[in-house]
Amino acid sequence: MRLNFTKLFAGAVALAWTTESMATNAVTAHLSPLSRSLDHIQSDDSTQRRLRTINGADEERFSRMSMAGLRRALELELKEMHLESVATNQLVVRICTILGIEVAKSTPTNLNKLAELIKVEKEAENVAKKVQNPVDQADVILGLLIYPVKQGDVLGNKLLEKWPLLPKKAIINRFHRLKNHEVPKEPQPFAAHVHAPVVVAH
């Protein structure tokens, strides 16, 4: 009798375990598509967030600069610049040197010489190929930003298209470096007896 009771009890336990297991499997089977769907959605969301982050970084890194955007970024600083200062005169000499434009002996005349930059507007591709050093590129753009030369922004935008790897930070840093070297208070152009270096056109 004891043996039969033991077998009966063992059978009941086994049946209960089997029933519970089947019920659990049924619930799991019922929920698993939803669970898989949620996992898939979460995975998709994570992927999208990751892609947005990557794309956002790429967009910021490779966003095309424009002369208008640079002017907005340097609006206050540009207003404080003195076109006749020693520093800006030296910038003109440097830009003319970079582009192979002959520099006059008297520095104030070099301000007029900068207008010759516009002659290369239709040759922006040649200028872009010639000027490969990022520092030189930044200075050319900086010169076009500082001086209100006719069609300067048109030329600048064309050059920026040709120099997609030139970072905005490089231009801004060059600007601040120029500004820090500027003569304080009332900057004056070079005296008549002070001659800028003569640059022979290449």
From Swiss-Prot:
Keywords: Host cytoplasm, Host nucleus, Secreted, Signal, Virulence. GO terms for cellular component: extracellular region; host cell cytoplasm; host cell nucleus. A motif (RxLR-dEER) lies at residues 49-61. Residues 1-23 form the signal peptide. Induction: Expression is up-regulated at later stages of infection. It is found in: Secreted; Host cytoplasm; Host nucleus. The keyword Secreted applies. Effector that acts as a broad suppressor of cell death to interrupt plant immunity. Inhibits cell death induced by cell death-inducing proteins, including the PAMP elicitor INF1 from P.infestans. Belongs to the RxLR effector family. The RxLR-dEER motif acts to carry the protein into the host cell cytoplasm through binding to cell surface phosphatidylinositol-3-phosphate. This is Secreted RxLR effector protein 11.
